[in-house]
Amino acid sequence: MAAGADGPLLFCYDGSEDAKHAIERAGGLLASRHALVLTVWQPTALLGSFAWSGATANMVDYVALDRAAAEDGGRVADDGVRLAQGAGLEAEPVTIKAAGPVWETIIEIADSHDAAAIVMGSRGLTAVSRMLLGSVSSAVIHHADRPTLVVHRPSDEGAH
């Protein structure tokens, strides 16, 4: 689905410094727009034979871990909303559990809300993603059918 120019801006927010910078910089450029601050959380994977071992007491721990991840995702999204509002955007949180790759979830949410554009930092929280253009941002760039803004942080933390 192609983007609607009047749709909200979709800010992808995971709490990383890159995501914070993206909201601050892009929010300043696009102030007064309606924005959704999306936090995608991933469920705890049930690995290998453990998932089929019948150890239901341990599976309850996975449910608790997923519940905690969902709650944490909500807090992260709320933090992103506060940043977006501070940058002049009319923002609301969206928190969702990934049913597959995070980039697919981002595109699905952008489509379902007819987002005018997707805005994200270049790298996320993981050490591996800091080595490259983040795999999520790279996949979104290549698969999104709407404008996508990837905001890079200055290499010198003191530079603006």
Language model region names:
Residues G28, D111-S112, H142:
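Solvent-exposed polar/charged
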Residues M1-G4, D79-I118, D156-H160:
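Structural beta-alpha unit
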Residues S53-T56, A110-S112, V136-S137:
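Short, hinge-like loop/turn segments at secondary-structure boundaries
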Residues R25, D72-G80, T105:
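Short, solvent-exposed amphipathic alpha-helices that sit
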Residues L36-L38, E92-I96, L149:
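General small-molecule cofactor/ligand-binding pocket signal
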Residues A2-V60, L89:
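Small/aliphatic-rich secondary-structure junction motif
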Residues A2-D6, W103, A117-A139, H143, ...:
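Glycine-rich, Arg-bearing micro-motifs that act as flexible, cationic patches
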Residues N58-R75:
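A short acidic, glycine-rich active-site loop
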